């Protein structure tokens, strides 16, 4: 068994939507990023890579590379999952928490779960996506950005 933990944060910028868990959510701002800014999938990718001791997404998809400019984070997550499989591990479960004052996440949580389950090749009952606010405290509470935490549990695949 392996456990991985990931964290990501992106600041708000001009825009009219954010992408979280591969779901486009209308909002008064976008997220500043080299890729599509999906903090949920970035935190999850870091958790998966950490669990198999391969570092972080910045190592594989550097923001200094034009190759990854505007990248679809679902594609990045699928690439990370392939590396996890190549290391001989499979997902037991995923638990994530989006930290944001806005936009409201509840209407979009199920679609996020389904996207993640599809990209990881696991049943949806192994994927948890939760959301919380910081009661208007800190940078997320002031509406300056969105953060996400992710934890994964992996098990060795029988050869």
From Swiss-Prot:
Cofactor: a divalent metal cation
Keyword Cell wall biogenesis/degradation: no
Amino acids binding a divalent metal cation: 8, 10, 42
UniProt cofactor note: Binds 1 divalent metal cation per subunit.
UniProt keywords, alphabetically: Isoprene biosynthesis, Lyase, Metal-binding
Purpose of the protein: Involved in the biosynthesis of isopentenyl diphosphate (IPP) and dimethylallyl diphosphate (DMAPP), two major building blocks of isoprenoid compounds. Catalyzes the conversion of 4-diphosphocytidyl-2-C-methyl-D-erythritol 2-phosphate (CDP-ME2P) to 2-C-methyl-D-erythritol 2,4-cyclodiphosphate (ME-CPP) with a corresponding release of cytidine 5-monophosphate (CMP).
Protein name listed in UniProt: 2-C-methyl-D-erythritol 2,4-cyclodiphosphate synthase
Organism whose genome encodes this protein: Marinobacter nauticus (strain ATCC 700491 / DSM 11845 / VT8) (Marinobacter aquaeolei)
Gene: ispF
């Amino acid at each position: 068994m392996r456990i991985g933990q990931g964290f990501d944060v992106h600041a708000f910028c001009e825009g009219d939507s954010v992408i979280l868990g591969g779901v486009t959510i209308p909002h008064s701002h976008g997220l500043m990023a080299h890729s599509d800014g999906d903090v949920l999938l970035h935190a999850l990718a870091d958790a998966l890579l950490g669990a198999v001791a391969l570092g972080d997404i910045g190592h594989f998809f550097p923001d200094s590379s034009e190759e990854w400019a505007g990248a679809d984070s679902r594609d990045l997550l699928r690439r990370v999952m392939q590396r996890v499989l190549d290391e001989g591990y499979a997902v037991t479960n995923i638990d994530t928490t989006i930290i944001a004052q806005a936009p409201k996440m509840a209407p979009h949580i199920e679609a996020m779960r389904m996207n993640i389950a599809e990209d990881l090749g696991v049943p949806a009952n192994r994927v948890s996506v939760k959301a919380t606010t910081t009661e208007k405290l800190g940078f997320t509470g002031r509406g300056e950005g969105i953060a996400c935490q992710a934890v994964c549990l992996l098990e060795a695949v029988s050869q």
